[in-house]
Amino acid sequence: MLGVVDIGLGNNQSIYKFLRKIRHDYTVVATPDHLADIQKLIFPGVGTFKEAATRLQSTGLLGGIQKYIENDGSYLGICLGMQLMARLGYEVSLSEGFGIFDAEVVRMMPDQGLALPHIGWNSVQHDGSGMFSKIAINEDFYFVHSYFMRLDSPHIHFNSSYGGNFTAYVRSGNAHGVQFHPEKSQKAGQQFLKNFLEC
């Protein structure tokens, strides 16, 4: 069964709409008990790292999802759901994430006087393999964010650029994270989500 994390933040309705469109069954995950029969887990999100971490901690999902990923569960974190895979986040104030990556989520500081939040279409410097199978190398994806995961590790990752490079995709085992919104990225995003559901 596919689970979609819902802690009352973000854009879950667009994910639900996509899953209904392709007739893929899913269940809402709001407590650790809901993780019991989950084979794949999507964590969409728009919001602050601090608020999400607080809600996850209060529901017990912070530890529950961390354990799910550490046990090689198939996970896709979208935007905030990716950022929470880091060890620490500095949005609003210092908070702990799942700690899947020894990384920090920090505010972007784009060159050339570019505005924040970063909103719009940018290409991802991927190699066409794995989760990016059947997606053109120069394809654009849709981003909305002011923070990014600062990653200094050997884990698989691809960058995008907005006045400087930032991490757009990261992977550790069966856990994947994307800073962009595949559910809002038209055909390329739909293919990305299908690749995750079929992998």
Where do the model's predicted regions map?
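N-terminal beta1-alpha1 ligand-phosphate binding loop
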Residues: 2-23, 182-185
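Short glycine-/small-residue-rich Rossmann-like dinucleotide-binding loops
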Residues: 9, 45-47
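Short amphipathic alpha-helical segments
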Residues: 16-17, 53-56, 87-90, 155-156, ...
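Short acidic low-complexity segments
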Residues: 26-37
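Short, Asp-centered acidic motifs that coordinate Mg2+ and/or phosphate
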Residues: 40
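Cysteine-nucleophile active-site neighborhood
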Residues: 49-118
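Pocket-forming structural segment of enzyme catalytic cores
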Residues: 88-164
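C-terminal and late-domain segments of enzyme folds
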Residues: 148-199
